[in-house]
C-alpha cells in the first residue's frame, strides 16, 4: 500500500527539492564584498570578476571617488564559474571581468554581452577589442617562477629547451616540486595550455618531462606563488606575471622569467552581460577602467600593466593572444576532450 502524506508535507518536500536543485546549480563564489556608496545615492553596480579583491579593490575605490553615490558589489569566482554564472544561470551582473579570454569571447560571440560604445571605448586599439562587446583594459605576461635559492649554481632557463634540459638533468631537485595550472579545472589554465600548444611542439615535450616529476596542479596563480615562496615548489610554470611581480618584488630568492623563445601575453577583458539590470552603470564602470583615472589606478594601485602596443614591439618574444573568434577553437566539446586526453597522457594522469 502506497503511503499517503499530507499536502503541507508534500509542499515542503517539493520546496526543499527545488532549493536543493537551485543550490546545486549555483556557481561557486570565492569572495564577495560590498563597497558602500560614499554619499547617498541608492544605486549599486554589481561586478563579477576573476580578479582578486586585493588587486582590483583599489580601482573600485578610485571609481567611487569619482562616483560617490554608487555602491559596488564585487564578487570573485574562478573563470569557469564566472562563465557558468552568465551562460548557464543568467545571473544579473552589470560587468564581468575575466582573464579567460576564450570564455569571454564565447559569451560575446553567443550574444550574451551587450554592445557598449563611447569615446573611451573608441580609443581602445582594434587588437584589444572585439566589435562593441568585448574590451581589454590590461595586458599581462604569462611567466615562469623559479627558486634561485633551490637552483643554486644551476643555470636559470631562458627558453623551453633550456627548461626541459634543466628538469631532465635534475630530477631529484624537481620531483614533487613543479607546479602548473590544472587545465581541466581552471579556465585560465586551459587557455594558457591550449595557446602554448599552438605556439610550439616543445610544449608537449615539456609536459611529458613535468609529468615524470610528480607535478602539483593548481587553480590559481596566488596558490603557486604561496608555495614557491615557502619552498614547497621550486618551479611554477604559466603564472600570471601581474600577480607575481608585486608579491615577489622584495623576494630575492625567486626569479620571474619571461622565456625568450616566446612568452604568452593575455588580455584581461570586460563585458556588460545581456542579463544586466543596470547596464548604464556597467558601462560607466567600463568607461572608468578605460579612462585616465581608471588607467592610473589600474597601473599604480592594482599593479596591472596597461594596454601598450609599444611594449609588445619592444619585446619581440612576447606573443599576445589574439582577441578574436579563433579563441573558440579549443572550446569545442570534442576538441576540449581530445586536448585534455592528450594532456593527461603527457602528464601520465590516466
Regions found by a protein language model. Name each.
Residues 102-106, 229-253:
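A ligand-binding cleft/hinge motif common to bilobed small-molecule-binding domains
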Residues 328-350:
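Conserved C-terminal helix/tail region of periplasmic/extracytoplasmic solute-binding proteins
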Residues 273-330:
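Mature extracytoplasmic/periplasmic domains
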Residues 46, 50-51, 57, 92, ...:
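Extracytoplasmic ligand-binding site segments that recognize negatively charged/polar headgroups
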Residues 71-78, 97, 213-221, 257-258:
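Short beta-strand-to-loop elements that line the ligand-binding cleft
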Residues 122-127, 139-140, 206-211, 249-274:
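Periplasmic-binding protein-like
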Residues 143-150, 192-194, 266-278, 297:
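A bilobed periplasmic-binding-protein/Venus flytrap-type ligand-binding module shared by bacterial periplasmic
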